[in-house]
Regions:
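C-terminal lobe and adjacent flexible extensions of AdoMet/dcAdoMet transferase-like proteins
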Residues: 10-12, 34-39, 50, 240-297
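A short glycine-rich, Lys/Arg-flanked "PGG" loop and its adjoining helix->strand segment in the class I
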Residues: 181-196
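Conserved alpha-helix/loop element of class I SAM-dependent methyltransferases that forms part
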Residues: 50-97, 108-111, 115
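Short alpha-helix
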Residues: 225-241
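N-terminal auxiliary segments of SAM/dcSAM-dependent transferases
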Residues: 2-58
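Short, glycine-/aromatic-enriched active-site segment of Class I SAM-dependent methyltransferases
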Residues: 203-224
């Protein structure tokens, strides 16, 4: 690891909600997901996994195929809090090294590990210790521990190792991070030249009343409080040095999906918005899936 690397936005990223510092937001998020992991997740009331169980949502929305679902231990399904399936469009090849930023309970680690095969490796990066332990448990249950490594680290942190990954995936995580440029800097660093990213994340689209946006940010709840406009988000990706940026899919959340996304990982763990406030964001919260490449030097 390169210990001499500097943070991209200072020790304490500036962009925060109007009422909380970046450090406070991250601590709240870490505790929230750790508590959720301690309980082993839940098959109900998940953020993007709207209506009923995580499994039914995934199948219903084609996020994960039936073949995918058959490979995933129940624990990983219950801990799953994604908004897409980056392994389905990441073009992962046998023998590659895949890093999952904010790997959570390991659902995408399992699928990526099957794709890289016995000569490849997957690396789960997450800052919540109990979540990371659950992902280890999941990989063991799936019989894939020999091709999995874990790094317990903030993905905004410059201690993330350099030039080791062919592919970086991330599923519904970067919206939670106060300093998105910091995360994309670390994704750039961990990728080998010519490597690529495949991301599923939550963004906003269309006009959002600034007061409504400020209100959402002040609570920083679920996977909507930190969501930023898609065009600004994609500019951050390009400014980090990535090329060949391509949005491969978008899904606009309906009110029910929005309600569950806004209280991710579940109403017991996260602050919630009133139905009235959520209605003001309806049609404007989108799950976007995109690819980009780190140019060869
Ligand atoms: C919404 S869950 C998604 C988990 C997983 N990707 C999935 O699809 O189920 C967000 C995950 O990102 C992790 N996370 C959030 N912010 C992080 C940060 N700054 N550094 C590392 N992990 C982070 C949380 O601990 C949690 O496990």
């Amino acid at each position: 690891m390169n210990k001499a690397k500097k943070p991209c936005c200072g020790e304490e990223p500036e962009e925060t909600s109007p009422q909380k510092t970046a450090a406070e937001i991250k601590q709240e998020i870490k505790v929230r997901y750790d508590e959720f992991a301690k309980e082993g997740g839940s098959a109900e009331g998940c953020c993007p996994l709207v209506g009923g169980s995580a499994e039914s949502f995934a199948l219903e929305h084609g996020l994960y195929s039936q073949e995918d679902m058959a490979l995933i231990p129940k624990l990983a399904i219950n801990l799953s809090r994604g908004c897409g399936n980056p392994t389905s469009f990441a073009n992962i090849q046998p023998g590659q090294v895949v890093a999952d930023f904010g790997s959570g309970g390991g659902i995408d680690l399992v699928l990526a590990a099957h794709k890289v095969g016995p000569t490849g490796k997957v690396i789960g990066v997450d800052f919540a210790p109990h979540m990371s332990e659950r992902a280890k448990q999941v990989m063991a249950e799936a019989g894939l521990s020999d091709r999995a490594e874990f790094i317990l680290l903030d993905i905004e942190n410059p201690q993330v190792p350099d030039n080791i990954a062919d592919v970086v995936i991330s599923n519904c995580v970067i919206n939670l991070c106060p300093c998105k440029p910091c995360v994309y800097k670390q994704i750039y660093e961990i990728l080998k030249p010519g490597g690529h990213l495949a991301i599923s994340d939550i963004v906003t689209r269309g006009e959002v009343d600034p007061k409504v946006r400020e209100y959402f940010q002040s609570i920083w709840a679920g996977c909507t409080g930190g969501a930023i406009p898609e065009d600004g988000y994609l500019k951050i990706v390009q400014d980090a040095g990535f090329s060949q940026l391509k949005v491969v899919a978008r899904h606009t959340l309906n009110l029910k999906e929005l309600d569950e996304m806004a209280s991710c990982p579940g109403k017991k763990f996260s602050p919630t918005f009133s139905k009235e406030k959520l209605a003001q964001m309806q049609g404007k919260i989108v799950s976007a899936k995109f690819l980009a490449v780190k140019p060869k030097e």
